[in-house]
Amino acid sequence: MPNWTSNTLKVKGNKSDRDAFAKSMADFIKDKVKPLVAEWVASNPDKCRKEYERSVTPKIDFNFVIPMPKELEGTTSPRPKTRDEIMQLAKDHSWDEESLKWRLEHALSDEDAARLDELKSRFGYDNWYEWCIVNWGTKWNACHSEDCDVVETAQMTIYRFSTAWSPPTPFVHALAIAFPKLTFRLEYTLEGESGKWSMTGDPEKYEGCRKALKEQNERLEQAAIKIISSL
């Protein structure tokens, strides 16, 4: 399980602009929620239907402004090794026969390797994890529990939600670009760390944020490869 980051996103601006933002995101999310089976709806109280909709309808969806390519869904990180790569690694490792056999049996096929190469060429990444870290700032979409909600005040709209390990800074930058009339203030709390940002529609800041996360992710990836190669 990850360390969870508690996020509070404060959206400030004219009420009409905030309402337009809230409606556009709610409509996007609503289209993704799987409807209940008609027979179930007919045989259960209305409060059950409302509870279902509440439990499966998130308040925030990062795909709203930064959609993850569907082709990356179900991919694996880090990328599996091909048979040739495994045999090359075996020269520098004292794997026993069973260990080497297992690795070869689970090796990446040439066909799958070509498919992953194509994904990386198209999207910059061949797996969902690395793409999410750089484009969303966290490995999963926004996570919601009973303490996650939306609060409306006269001055702002407040969204509370959780993310894994880190705050979704690139997502908030992208919101600010998509809705330049609004100001987005993200406050987060992680174990031993907290922070605040106020963001407006500045594309350069968004690209700078993505670049920093990309460089960080590449460093982590190289460290992970060294660890995995030593096993």
Predicted regions and their residues:
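Intrinsic low-complexity, intrinsically disordered or marginally ordered coil/linker segments
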Residues: 1-231
